[in-house]
Amino acid sequence: MSGKCRKIMYALVVTVFAAFLWMICCENDRKVSDKAIGETTVQSMRSGEKTVSLEQSDIPKIEIKDLTDAFTVILQYAPKDMLAGCTVDESFLMWFYAQYGRDAVIHIAFDVLDGGNDPDVWYEETGNSIHVLWLLYCRDSGFGQHELENVYWMQTAAASEMVFGFAGDINFAENWYTTEYMKEQPDGLRDCFSEDLLAQMQGVDVMIMNNEFTYANKKGATSVYGKAYTFRADPQKAELLEIFGTDTVTLANNHVYDYGKRGLLSTLDVLDQEGIPYSGAGRNLKDASKIIYYVMNGRKVAFVSAT
């Protein structure tokens, strides 16, 4: 069976299972009448249309006794700020219930009735933001797989914080004075930095470097005309990024195109081979504009690079 068929079958199984759980939860539950809901117009987040903003006074008095009530309140009356652009529908709530239990659903519903609109209520209840919950739902259900592109799940040194490290320009270019100095050292790049500094760079949760040169072989690589300084590094030097504990490199700089299109594509190929995510340049505009996401400690952090 192909991978695509397995994903489709898995998605169908999840859908059927969610529907079965919904039937069990709804059995003997009190239904909220149309009169109780009132004539307030509420547009579903799934429709893709603009969501009507509701004041607390617009929400009818609903006594939450069971999951049916809780689902109704969240689906009909949760403000768009609380949902933070995520598609919270019946399927998502059934998954949420299966993962975090009845009380978590009801607590969210009570927050809606209390006029809450802070999306952090999801994090406070589960330890995951609504954005991370949505990614977990997509991962588990097989739906919205495009949402998982360029997402990196990172372990942090401490549960209470996320530590990012940012370095300025790095340059491994051939015949450049810093590269020549590095070659003269017994332990190469490691001798160019103190052990304490390298340990600090390797110890952060995410280390980001600005790749201020191109990776390309000398044969066939031609620098662009008219530039006073052009930087080209042997592709094998990409292995040095590991010494810094590099997690991502930025390419939105004035030297990534020093060797034209061929040099740029070679740089992207080398980084892909090393498994180093990059931002700020790409094989096309979409690739160059991509956002890199890190998920740490229940939070989703977006990173972009531009110049």
Description of each model-found segment:
Residues 1-14:
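N-terminal Sec-pathway targeting helices
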Residues 14-20:
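Bacterial N-terminal signal peptides
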